[in-house]
A protein has these predicted regions:
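Conserved N-terminal diphosphate/IPP-binding helix and adjacent helical/loop segment
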Residues: 2-145, 149, 155, 161-164, ...
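Acidic, Mg2+-coordinating active-site segments of isoprenoid diphosphate-utilizing enzymes
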Residues: 58-66, 130, 154-177, 186, ...
Length: 365
């Protein structure tokens, strides 16, 4: 093992010269990003039949760096600060529930909503608001709401009738920790609480109504729920590239896209600005899912906090399954570059959104 962290190796080229074979090896970190390339020479000492005794193997070059770039480090620092604010808001929303909410339901909601996670969607909402001159404070209700929708979707996705998962964010899933009925109700409750949070947290009624409409459409039958329905259907009937994109654009991409648009709404964005945020969100939503598919193939449960390898076991449509690992990684990078270019017109204020887009392909979980 060279350097720190887990790596995997891939033979990417091979050339022979006389009795010496040179093998180019590319090493990847657990985040599916190239860490280094090096050459190994394998010299056969004689022309006789090869055996384990007649080879000399030499490692010529090794260079590994697992340190995050300055750009990524800056984003992660800001991310940590905003996550604290988001978690405080989420905790407050749960604590404000009256005694009419049963204790077991409240605890199941809290267990899932406040479990350790990236808070990627609410952070994206807040960064979207800031990119257009708004404040994270004014966008916080929308940010909390989108995390509630995301948490509700995870609770339901993990159920035995859906993806049948027992591990989420490094902890037992909600239906394992409590029971199936409580998990279903906790998901239902978080969905309802999301819209209540938007309506009670936005002082401008117009922004509140528009925000509810965006989130409802993204989470509903034409968005996340529709994508999940097609995903389950594809496990039985199969599908191709068109179905793959249709599933992920809705199941994962729709809520990510809505997150940044909700930030724009909180910042009183113009229709043109909202359209650019929508395109940006669509691009990084697809990139995010591609990387998720790659992590399921190449990472570990300890690293991702959820069971890996399950997509191939269930016969799910995935980008690596159709395009292969290398082509999938290239596609993710292309979508990220498209996302970055679309927010260029926002000027210096778009820096955080650009950093966020690059993080999508750099992440390890």
């Amino acid at each position: 093992m060279w350097g720190s962290g887990s790596v995997r190796c891939q033979n990417v080229a091979q050339a022979s010269c006389s009795l010496t074979t040179f093998i180019a090896v590319k090493v990847y970190n657990t985040n599916a990003r190239p860490a280094c390339e090096f050459w190994i020479s394998v010299k056969q000492n004689s022309a006789r039949t090869p055996s384990t005794e007649c080879f000399e193997t030499n490692l010529h070059t090794v260079q590994i760096s697992n340190e995050p770039s300055n750009e990524t480090a800056a984003l992660l620092s800001r991310w940590k600060s905003l996550t604290t604010e988001v978690d405080s808001k989420l905790e407050n929303c749960i604590e404000k529930l009256s005694k009419r909410c049963p204790d077991v339901l409240r605890e199941a909601m809290r267990y899932s909503l406040l479990s350790p996670g990236k808070r990627l969607r609410p952070i994206l909402c807040l960064l979207g608001a800031e990119a257009l001159g708004g404040s994270s404070f004014n966008a916080m209700a929308n940010a909390a709401a989108v995390e509630m929708i995301h948490s509700y979707s995870l609770i339901h996705d993990d159920l035995p009738a859906m993806d049948d998962d027992d591990l989420r964010r490094g902890r037992p899933t909600c239906h394992i920790q409590f029971d199936e009925a409580t998990a279903i109700l906790a998901g239902d409750a978080l969905q309802a609480l999301a819209f209540e949070t938007i309506l009670s947290g936005n002082t401008d009624p117009s922004i509140a109504v528009k925000s509810c409409l965006v989130l409802a459409k993204a989470a509903g039958p034409e968005g996340m729920v529709g994508g999940q329905s097609d995903d389950l259907r594809a496990e039985k009937l199969g599908g191709g590239v068109e179905m793959l994109h249709a599933i992920h654009a809705r199941k994962t991409g729709a809520i990510i896209q809505a997150s940044v648009v909700l930030g724009g709404l909180a910042a009183n964005a113009t229709p043109e600005e909202l359209e650019k945020l929508s395109i940006y969100g669509d691009c990084i939503g697809i990139a995010f899912q591609i990387v998720d598919d790659l992590l399921d193939v190449e990472s570990t449960s300890e690293n991702t906090g959820k069971r890996t390898g399950k997509d191939s076991e269930r016969g799910k449509l995935t980008f690596p399954g159709i395009f292969g690992v290398r082509a999938s990684r290239d596609r993710a990078a292309e979508f990220v570059e498209q996302a970055i270019s679309i927010v260029d017109s926002f000027g210096p204020a778009s820096t955080s959104l650009k950093q966020f887009a690059r993080y999508i392909t750099d992440r390890s979980h």
